[in-house]
C-alpha cells in the first residue's frame, strides 16, 4: 500500500512540477482580443464561413469590411447582414492573387485590428488527373493570396498605437493537418499556412499582434456542396471519418478562438487530436494544453497510426474493387 501511495505522490509531484515549468516557458501568452468598436476585415467574406464570421463580428459591435471577387455575392452578403443586424458593412471587390488590388482595398478600408484571411478554393482530383493550371490556381489563391493580404495589411496594423492587441487569423483546413487522397494540391496549399503562421507570429508578436490558425472540418457551405459533387469517391469515404459541421457552429468556435488569442483553433475532438499529432513547433499559449500535448502526444500518435491504417485499408479495398470492375468490363 505504501508503494502505491508513493507512486501516486510521485505522479502528482511530477504533474505539478511540469505545470510550473510550462507556466514559465509557454509563449506567446494568450490575450483577449477585443471586438467591439474595432475594425474586422474578412477576405472570402461573401459566403460560407467568412460570411458567418462577418455576421458574428457585426453582432458583437465591430466595424466590418468584407472582401471577395464577386460584386454580386458581396452585394448579397451586405444585404443579408443588414437585414439580420441593421448594420451596414463595407465591401471590397478584389482578387487576392492581385497584390495591388488587395493593397488598394485594404488602404481604403482603414487600419485593421482583426484580419481574418479566409479565402479558399478547392478542386478535388488525384494529382495525375489535375492540370498544372488547377494546381497553380489553388496555390495562388489559398497560399500566395494569404501572403498578399497579410503583407498589404501589416504596415498599418503595426503602426496602431493604443488600440489594444490585434489579430491575424488564417483559415486552413483539416486537410492542412493531414494529407488526404484527392487533396494533393489543396493539402499542400493549406499545409503552407502552418509555416506562414508560425514564422509570422515570431515576426509580429513584439507589435502586439497575435496569429491564429483555424482548422475547420468539412463544413456545409455552398462551396462544400459543389466539392461533394466533384471530388473522388475515395476522398469522400476517407473524409467521412472526421464528419462535417454546420457553418454557424464552425464560425462560433473559430470566432471564440480568435477572441481568446489562441494560436491553434480546432472545431471538434478529431480536429483536436489532429492538432496535437501535427503540433510540431507550433506556439502554445495555454500551459494546460501544453501539458496535454506533453503527456498524451505519444498516445495520440498511436491513434493517428490507427487512422492511417484504416485509410490505407480503405484505399486497398477500393483499388481492388475498381480493378475487378475494369477487368470484368474487358472480359
Swiss-Prot record:
Cytoplasmic side: 29-262, 308-331
Tissue: Expressed in roots, leaves, stems and flowers.
Motif extent (GXSXG): 44-48
Primary location class: endoplasmic reticulum
Molecular-function GO terms, alphabetical: 3-dehydrosphinganine reductase activity; NADPH binding
Membrane topology, from the record: Multi-pass membrane protein
Record-linked InterPro entries: KDSR-like, NAD(P)-bd_dom_sf, Sc_DH/Rdtase_CS, SDR_fam
Subcellular location: Endoplasmic reticulum membrane
EC number assigned by the record: 1.1.1.102
Transmembrane segments: 8-28, 263-283, 287-307
GO biological processes: 3-keto-sphinganine metabolic process; sphingolipid biosynthetic process
Binding residues for NADPH: 44, 46-48, 69, 73, 95
Example of a GO cellular component annotation carried by this entry: endoplasmic reticulum membrane
List of catalytic residues: 172, 186, 190
Lumenal topology ranges: 1-7, 284-286
This protein's record includes keyword Transmembrane helix: yes
Keyword 4Fe-4S: no
Protein's pathway: Lipid metabolism; sphingolipid metabolism
Residues annotated as binding NADP(+): 186, 190
This protein's UniProt keywords: Endoplasmic reticulum, Lipid metabolism, Membrane, NADP, Nucleotide-binding, Oxidoreductase, Sphingolipid metabolism, Transmembrane, Transmembrane helix
Functional description taken from the UniProt entry: Catalyzes the reduction of 3'-oxosphinganine (3-ketodihydrosphingosine/KDS) to sphinganine (dihydrosphingosine/DHS), the second step of de novo sphingolipid biosynthesis. In plants, sphingolipids seems to play a critical role in mineral ion homeostasis, most likely through their involvement in the ion transport functionalities of membrane systems in the root. Is stereospecific for D-erythro-DHS production and does not produce L-threo-DHS.
Homology family: Belongs to the short-chain dehydrogenases/reductases (SDR) family.
Name this protein carries in UniProt: 3-dehydrosphinganine reductase TSC10B
Amino acid at each position: 500500500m505504501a508503494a502505491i501511495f508513493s507512486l501516486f505522490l510521485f505522479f502528482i509531484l511530477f504533474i505539478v512540477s511540469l505545470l510550473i515549468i510550462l507556466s514559465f516557458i509557454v509563449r506567446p501568452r494568450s490575450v483577449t482580443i477585443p471586438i467591439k468598436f474595432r475594425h474586422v476585415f474578412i477576405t472570402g467574406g461573401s459566403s460560407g464561413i467568412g460570411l458567418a464570421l462577418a455576421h458574428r463580428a457585426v453582432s458583437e459591435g465591430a466595424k466590418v469590411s468584407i472582401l471577395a471577387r464577386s460584386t454580386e455575392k458581396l452585394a448579397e452578403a451586405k444585404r443579408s447582414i443588414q437585414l439580420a443586424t441593421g448594420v451596414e458593412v463595407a465591401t471590397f471587390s478584389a482578387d487576392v492573387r492581385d497584390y495591388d488590388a488587395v493593397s488598394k482595398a485594404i488602404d481604403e478600408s482603414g487600419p485593421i485590428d482583426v484580419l481574418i484571411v479566409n479565402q479558399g478554393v478547392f478542386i478535388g482530383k488525384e494529382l495525375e488527373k489535375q492540370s498544372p493550371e488547377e494546381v497553380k490556381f489553388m496555390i495562388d489563391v489559398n497560399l500566395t493570396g494569404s501572403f498578399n493580404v497579410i503583407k498589404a495589411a501589416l504596415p498599418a496594423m503595426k503602426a496602431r498605437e493604443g488600440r489594444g492587441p490585434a489579430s491575424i487569423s488564417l483559415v486552413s483546413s483539416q486537410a492542412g493537418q493531414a494529407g488526404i487522397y484527392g487533396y494533393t494540391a489543396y493539402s499542400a496549399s493549406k499545409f503552407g499556412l502552418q509555416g506562414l503562421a508560425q514564422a509570422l507570429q515570431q515576426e509580429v508578436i513584439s507589435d502586439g499582434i497575435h496569429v491564429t490558425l483555424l482548422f475547420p472540418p468539412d463544413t456545409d457551405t455552398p462551396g462544400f456542396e459543389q466539392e461533394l459533387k466533384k471530388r473522388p469517391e475515395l476522398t469522400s469515404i476517407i473524409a467521412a471519418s472526421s464528419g462535417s459541421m454546420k457553418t454557424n457552429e464552425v464560425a462560433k468556435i473559430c470566432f471564440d478562438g480568435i477572441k481568446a488569442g489562441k494560436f491553434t483553433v480546432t472545431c471538434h475532438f478529431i480536429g483536436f487530436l489532429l492538432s496535437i499529432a501535427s503540433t510540431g513547433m507550433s506556439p502554445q499559449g495555454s500551459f494546460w494544453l501544453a501539458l496535454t500535448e506533453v503527456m498524451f502526444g505519444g498516445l495520440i500518435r498511436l491513434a493517428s497510426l490507427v487512422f492511417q491504417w484504416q485509410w490505407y485499408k480503405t484505399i486497398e479495398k477500393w483499388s481492388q474493387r475498381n480493378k475487378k470492375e475494369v477487368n470484368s468490363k474487358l472480359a
